[in-house]
Regions:
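Carbohydrate-interacting/catalytic domains
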Residues: 2-155
Length: 155
């Protein structure tokens, strides 16, 4: 691999916007697969760039649709804010294989590690505890998990 984020040719996500569509725009030719929407949100909300949320996925609709999705998206948005992930935050791809992708993003307040794909076994050394700072699970679901760890406090 190139060590660049998926879907980029320059690795400069600050110059673009990420979007998970619901298919109610245009003719729906490039509809994001509904069964993978949360994987998509786990990616765009943990990685550098400018995430763009599809409104019906971000709020519970009056008829109750998307309630669980909206709650999980809100959790990920809050994690992104708390970690201080912005358009040009550094990202390091730790594993990129056919059944698992693991990356670490350095926000201004915390590091975030995201795992995408069906495989859950990866080397424990990828997420070591350092100086008493443990990784905390922020969100998880079918084929994704997100952890964060605050930066050391400065005296």
């Amino acid at each position: 691999g190139t060590g660049q984020q998926a879907g980029t040719d320059s690795g400069r996500m600050k110059d673009g916007s990420d979007f998970i569509g619901g298919g109610s725009y245009g003719q729906g030719h490039w509809r994001f697969p509904p069964e993978h929407r949360m994987l998509g949100y786990a990616y765009i909300l943990t990685h550098p760039g400018v995430p763009c949320l599809f409104w019906p996925h971000a709020v519970r609709m009056p008829d109750g649709r998307h309630g669980d999705m909206a709650a999980e998206v809100a959790t990920m948005v809050q994690m992104r804010k708390n970690a201080g992930i912005v358009a040009d935050s550094p990202v390091e791809i730790l594993i990129a294989e056919s059944d698992v992708y693991v990356a670490r993003v350095r926000g201004s307040n915390a590091d975030v590690t995201v795992k995408l794909g069906p495989r859950y076994d990866f080397p424990k050394e990828i997420m070591p505890a350092e100086g008493g700072r443990e990784w905390k699970m922020c969100a998880s679901g079918k084929d994704y998990a997100i952890w964060s760890r605050p930066h050391p406090t400065r005296a």
